[in-house]
């Protein structure tokens, strides 16, 4: 078994060793270490020993169920600090809010940046450029829950959503993309634009109506999200964008089908590796055994 894992790690190392920027992508993981969260976290750490990851992109629902109450909530330890304790995961984490964080104190999620050195969250939505020797990728982090009507219509379960201005975020996104000059542009959010899911259709139609036209107009390379708890790669006809659903890093939803434009699906849990050179951007989907299930590639 150890030899098998070592072989897998060598394959991952070979897959990212030539990249100038390499990032881990994880989401939907906060389950106190259960439902494979802890083993997957340990696998991420072992892979980080072999590959020079610059940061972790945490795409929401770091805390499932009711979010957190404060920066001192014990869930910070049981969902995050104790679970992702590997020395090689003590790198910057760039998070966004998921719908489950909105059931609790969202300001505490931002304020945790004052508690944890690795928790880098300057705002509810923001932009970050990662640079290699001869390439650059801009990652734009969205706060998608306020962009979806159903959360505004449920103030009892999502009490602070109505305080957020969707129009301001969308105007910011348009301006940010218009000014972007990096080699690669990746937009990340918690909710999908396209996906097969039993969740509310309204979530996707609102994202298609409000976010997708901006992304298409500026011809971004990838949109990466979580929320659905399985892996999906979708390339709808007429869109220049690769739409990626990253699986849960704990409890996944095994049943997943296809929609128009589906390239790949898997119900396994796991995480992804986003990497790039000047000529290639790719995302490797990794399962809980460390196997590469599918690779999304874009070339210049």
Predicted segments, located by residue:
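Extended active-site neighborhood of metal-dependent phosphoesterases/phosphodiesterases
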Residues: 64-185, 200-206, 210-222, 230-277, ...
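Active-site glycine-centered loops adjacent to acidic/histidine catalytic or metal-binding residues
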Residues: 28, 60-61, 98-99, 142, ...
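N-terminal active-site segment of His-dependent metallophosphoesterases
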Residues: 17-74, 167-168
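Generic beta-strand structural signal
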Residues: 25, 58, 236, 276-281, ...
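Residue-level signal for glycine
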Residues: 290-292
């Amino acid at each position: 078994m150890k030899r098998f894992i070592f072989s897998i790690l060598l394959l991952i190392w070979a897959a990212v060793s030539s990249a100038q920027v390499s990032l881990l992508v994880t989401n939907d993981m906060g389950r106190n270490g259960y439902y494979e969260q802890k083993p997957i976290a340990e696998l991420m750490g072992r892979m980080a020993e072999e590959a020079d990851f610059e940061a972790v992109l945490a795409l929401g629902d770091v805390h499932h169920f009711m979010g957190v109450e404060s920066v001192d909530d014990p869930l910070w330890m049981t969902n995050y600090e104790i679970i992702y304790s590997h020395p090689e995961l003590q790198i910057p984490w760039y998070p966004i809010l998921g719908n489950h964080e909105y059931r609790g104190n969202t300001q505490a999620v931002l304020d945790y940046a004052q508690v944890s050195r690795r928790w880098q969250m300057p705002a509810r939505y923001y932009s970050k450029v990662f640079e290699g020797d001869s390439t650059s990728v801009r990652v734009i982090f969205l706060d998608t829950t306020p962009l979806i009507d159903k959360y505004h219509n449920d103030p009892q379960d999502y009490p602070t959503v109505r305080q957020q201005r969707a129009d301001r975020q969308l105007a910011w996104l348009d301006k940010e993309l218009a000014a972007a000059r990096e080699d690669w542009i990746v937009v990340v959010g918690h909710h999908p634009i396209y996906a097969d899911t039993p969740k509310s259709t309204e979530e996707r139609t609102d994202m298609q109506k409000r976010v997708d036209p901006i992304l298409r107009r500026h011809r971004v390379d990838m949109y990466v999200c979580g929320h659905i708890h399985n892996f999906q790669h979708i390339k709808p006809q007429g869109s220049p964008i690769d739409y990626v659903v990253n699986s849960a890093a704990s409890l996944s939803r095994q049943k997943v089908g296809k929609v128009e434009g589906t390239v790949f699906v898997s119900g396994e849990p796991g995480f992804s590796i986003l990497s790039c050179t000047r000529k290639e951007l790719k995302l490797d989907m990794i399962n809980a055994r460390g196997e590469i299930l599918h690779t999304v590639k874009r070339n210049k």
